């Protein structure tokens, strides 16, 4: 939680977003590792979901393609084991009741 609090300390935070697994999990891992040298304070990682009603068309299409490639929550967290970053990571996930 310290990384998140520090991202907002005395300034506005720069937050990036990526749909995990788009276009592939390997690409996502490499991209996230490169972002460590960016101006971002925090990275929001979208966990793909088959019916992302709250997202716009671009994010929905990326999530749909990732899901079609077999990306799920467990595979995203397995991929993240290979990510080395000093940035705060937060997640966007869906939950149906």
What do the PLM-derived regions correspond to, one by one?
Residues 25-35:
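Short, acidic/polar
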Residues 41-71:
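Glycine-rich, proline-tolerant flexible connector loops at the mouths of alpha/beta enzymes
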Residues 1-18, 79-81:
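N-terminal amphipathic alpha-helix/helix-capping segment at the start of soluble metabolic enzymes
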Residues 60-97:
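Glycine/small-residue-rich loop that forms an oxyanion/phosphate-binding "nest" at active or ligand-binding sites
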Residues 14-18, 41-45, 89-93:
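Hydrophobic faces of well-ordered beta-strands that scaffold small-molecule active sites
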Residues 1, 25, 69-73:
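A conditional alpha-helix N-cap/helix-loop micro-motif detector
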């Amino acid at each position: 939680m310290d990384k998140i609090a520090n991202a907002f300390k005395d300034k506005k935070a720069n937050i990036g977003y990526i749909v995990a697994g788009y276009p592939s999990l390997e690409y996502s891992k490499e991209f996230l590792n490169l972002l460590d040298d960016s101006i971002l304070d925090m990275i929001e990682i979208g966990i793909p979901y088959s019916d992302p009603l709250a997202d716009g068309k671009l994010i929905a299409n990326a999530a749909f393609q990732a899901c079609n490639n077999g990306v799920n929550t467990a595979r995203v967290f397995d991929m993240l084991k290979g990510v080395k970053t000093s940035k705060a990571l937060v997640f966007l996930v869906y939950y149906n009741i």
